[in-house]
Amino acid sequence: MSDITRIAVVGLGLIGKRHANILCRTPGVELSGVVEQSEGGQQEARRLGVPVFASLDELLSNGGSDGIILATPTPLHVDQGLACIAHECPVLIEKPIAVTAGEAKLLTDAAAAA
């Protein structure tokens, strides 16, 4: 087992960039990749020297991350969070975790059952 914890960031908007930059400066942590569609976000990932994935599914299939930070728009959190849980990949979801309380419960129930 490696002494380095590999964390990926999904979404390189304002918050995602903050997460990515902090991860790059944290001892014992490696920014293992990003998922980003925008050209600006892809340029930022290249500047950071990390792989860019076209989708969360591609990132999860790669298997190169010990955890994922979801810094995407709130309406995407439930599907993305459930995908991470299904792949048994620890996930930090930026707040709010869902649009409705029912969606949030769906996520927390899935995490508790995992």
Feature-to-residue mapping (PLM):
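N-terminal Rossmann-like dinucleotide-binding module
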Residues: 1-48
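Beta-loop-alpha module in the N-terminal Rossmann-like domain of NAD(P)-dependent dehydrogenases
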Residues: 50-110
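Short helix-capping segments at alpha-helix termini
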Residues: 27-28, 87, 112-114
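Residue-level detector of intrinsically disordered, flexible termini
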Residues: 7, 109-113
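Intrinsic low-complexity, intrinsically disordered segments enriched in polar/basic residues
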Residues: 1-2, 64, 113
